[in-house]
């Protein structure tokens, strides 16, 4: 997967748009990219898909498809919108266990895994324990540790390990596969 022309939640957008990102991909021999169509809280998944098609149309230099990002799994999203998009070919979606604008709680994750199982979709999970990161970050800030090297210290291996193992446990509960993305530590494997 890749991230193209994607808002980040702090009013900035990823540096590569569909033209520059797909040009780079083509130069490297890649013929298809799958960036994310990210739902905004309070918005619909269909709005996200429509927005990303507008961003790509006339700019993408190679083929593209979209993974979805689900941030607001309302009953309507779970019962109608997500199943309809899966039926139309959007068969993978990503969820987050971290980042305030994106993270879901375990119950929401279970609800989405149930849809994935029923509709035969793939769930990708960015697994980090948001509360541990927030707690560690607060301690760093209290001590004035703000240099880039302290970023890693607010995301110790145990933080990723716990969330990864929890995500796997939730998938086992529903007997549905998940793809853990952005694994950085041996303990999470």
Where in this protein do the model-derived segments appear?
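Divalent metal-coordination and catalytic microenvironments
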Residues: 1, 25, 29, 64, ...
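Metal-associated gating/positioning segment near the N- to mid-region
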Residues: 2-59
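Alpha-helix-loop-beta-strand connector modules within alpha/beta enzyme cores
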Residues: 45-63, 67, 111-125
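Active-site mouth loops of central-metabolism enzymes
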Residues: 2-16, 37-39, 65-78, 97-98, ...
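Histidine/acidic residue-rich metal-binding segments in metalloenzymes
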Residues: 80-189
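Gly-rich Lys/Arg/Thr-decorated short loops/hinges at beta-loop-alpha junctions or inter-strand turns
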Residues: 2, 30-35, 61, 65, ...
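Histidine-centered catalytic micro-motifs
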Residues: 1-7, 123-128
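Short, acidic/polar
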Residues: 14-22, 74-85, 166
């Amino acid at each position: 997967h890749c991230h193209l022309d994607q808002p980040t939640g702090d009013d900035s957008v990823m540096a590569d748009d569909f033209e520059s990102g797909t040009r780079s991909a083509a130069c490297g021999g890649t013929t298809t990219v799958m960036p994310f169509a990210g739902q905004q809280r309070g918005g619909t998944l269909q709005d996200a898909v429509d927005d990303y098609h507008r961003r790509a149309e006339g700019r993408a230099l190679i083929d593209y498809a979209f993974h979805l990002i689900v941030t607001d799994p309302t009953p309507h999203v779970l019962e109608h919108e997500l199943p309809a998009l899966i039926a139309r070919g959007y068969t993978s979606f990503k969820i987050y266990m971290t980042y305030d604008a994106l993270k879901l709680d375990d119950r929401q994750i279970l609800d989405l895994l149930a849809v994935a199982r029923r509709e035969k979709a793939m769930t990708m999970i960015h697994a980090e324990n948001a509360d541990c990161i927030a707690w560690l970050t607060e301690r760093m800030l209290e001590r004035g540790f703000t240099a880039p090297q302290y970023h890693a210290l607010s995301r110790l291996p145990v933080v990723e390990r716990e969330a990864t193992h929890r995500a796997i446990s939730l998938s086992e509960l529903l007997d549905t596969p998940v793809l853990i993305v952005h694994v950085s530590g041996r303990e999470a494997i």
